[in-house]
């Protein structure tokens, strides 16, 4: 399968740099997986698409202000993007500098260079940093960090992004990118969904910077997926099994919820799904057999990305690429701050061939 098969033309003008004034005020492109039929609407149409007893599964990770600027004590500017918090004082981070720091290098971080840190070790492409500070990592980042907006949002982060680039139900800090499908849910919509009898459950997947890394191989099967930490607790397992037992749909809010649920299903030895607390590097592309997810709420993804491959595996390759072409023609807004899709699973997708 060629990565190039998942390319599409996207005008720069359709990349959203700010969200809509109202979270639920975005547009919604509905794709019926089995038929390929498209329907244009607004996000609150989700209420009409869901039935009492359906289960919405959200990712409750919280984005941390993971980007810091500073310099080496010895000189030279540096940019740090925290990928994973190891403990109260240590992190794994991506580091950009004219010359990579060696172990033992002292750093001054923050716009006012008030945070002292030391590079203690290197792990492949990541650097282990220790903060020489009484405060814990999260307190430091909240004080001096910048929100890590995606590379395609070509502007500096603003104070408003601390709220806007965060779901209203975010709870567990650790992500360096938002689970963006969830950004469209506001409290009135969540209340209306509950009133209709829609069940809700929460997984955690701390989205890493790897989610923005391009696929650098020509054939999909050669791609090595980055690892992210995920939690699917027992209450989510119980909710999924109860939903299936009553003949209703498990609806994943975002590709991170999909990857969490399907990771838990793949790791389960006997039942459909079992609790999961581990790193996952699951890579879902056409041919994958979905075990848990029946419908999906998701944003529009980058050309040739692993996420458009995941959607193609869910809705069918031809359905997905046609939907994206129509979204461009109808001037939907793309990527993290853009519009959304509601997709029902196409059971024939895994048999479909990919390409022209």
From Swiss-Prot:
Function of the protein: Transfers and isomerizes the ribose moiety from AdoMet to the 7-aminomethyl group of 7-deazaguanine (preQ1-tRNA) to give epoxyqueuosine (oQ-tRNA).
User: Where does it live in the cell?
Assistant: Cytoplasm
Please describe the quaternary structure of this protein.
Answer: Monomer.
InterPro entries linked to this entry: QueA (IPR003699), QueA_dom1 (IPR042118), QueA_dom2 (IPR042119), QueA_sf (IPR036100)
Enzyme Commission designation: 2.4.99.17
Q: In which pathway does it act?
A: tRNA modification; tRNA-queuosine biosynthesis
Q: Which UniProt keywords apply?
A: Cytoplasm, Queuosine biosynthesis, S-adenosyl-L-methionine, Transferase
Major place of residence: cytoplasm
Which Pfam families is this protein grouped with? Answer: Queuosine_synth
Would you tell me the protein name for this molecule? S-adenosylmethionine:tRNA ribosyltransferase-isomerase
Q: Which organism is it from?
A: Serratia proteamaculans (strain 568)
């Amino acid at each position: 399968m060629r990565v190039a098969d998942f390319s599409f033309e996207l005008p720069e003008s359709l990349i959203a740099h700010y969200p809509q004034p109202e979270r639920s005020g975005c547009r919604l492109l509905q794709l019926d997986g089995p038929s390929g039929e498209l329907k244009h609407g607004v996000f609150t149409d989700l209420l009409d698409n869901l039935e009492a007893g359906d289960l919405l599964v959200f990712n409750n990770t919280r984005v941390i202000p993971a980007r810091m600027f500073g310099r080496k004590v010895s000189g030279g500017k540096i940019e740090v993007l925290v990928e994973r918090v190891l403990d109260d004082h240590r992190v794994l981070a991506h580091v950009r500098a004219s010359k990579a720091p060696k172990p033992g290098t002292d750093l001054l971080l923050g716009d006012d260079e008030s945070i002292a840190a030391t590079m203690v070790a290197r792990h492949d492409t990541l650097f282990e940093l220790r903060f020489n500070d009484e405060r814990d990592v999260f307190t430091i980042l909240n004080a001096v960090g910048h929100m890590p907006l995606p590379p395609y949002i070509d502007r500096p982060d603003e104070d408003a992004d601390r709220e806007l680039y965060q779901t209203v139900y975010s709870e567990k800090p650790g992500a360096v990118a938002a689970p963006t499908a969830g950004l469209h849910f506001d409290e009135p919509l969540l209340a209306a969904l509950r009133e209709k009898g829609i069940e809700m459950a929460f997984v955690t997947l701390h989205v890493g910077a790897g989610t923005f890394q391009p696929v650098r191989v020509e054939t999909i099967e050669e791609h090595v997926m980055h690892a992210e930490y995920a939690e699917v607790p027992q209450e989510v397992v119980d909710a999924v099994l109860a939903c299936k037992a009553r003949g209703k749909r498990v609806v994943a809010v975002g590709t991170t919820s999909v990857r969490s649920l399907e990771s838990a299903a793949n790791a389960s030895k006997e039942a459909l799904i079992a609790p999961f607390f581990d790193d996952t590097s699951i890579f879902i592309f056409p041919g994958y057999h979905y075990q848990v997810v029946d419908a999906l709420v998701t944003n529009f993804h980058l050309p040739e990305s692993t996420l458009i491959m995941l959607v193609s595996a869910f809705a069918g390759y031809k359905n997905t690429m046609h939907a994206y072409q129509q979204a461009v023609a109808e001037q939907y807004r793309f990527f993290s701050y853009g519009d959304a899709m509601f997709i029902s699973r196409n059971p024939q997708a895994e048999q479909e061939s990919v390409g022209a």
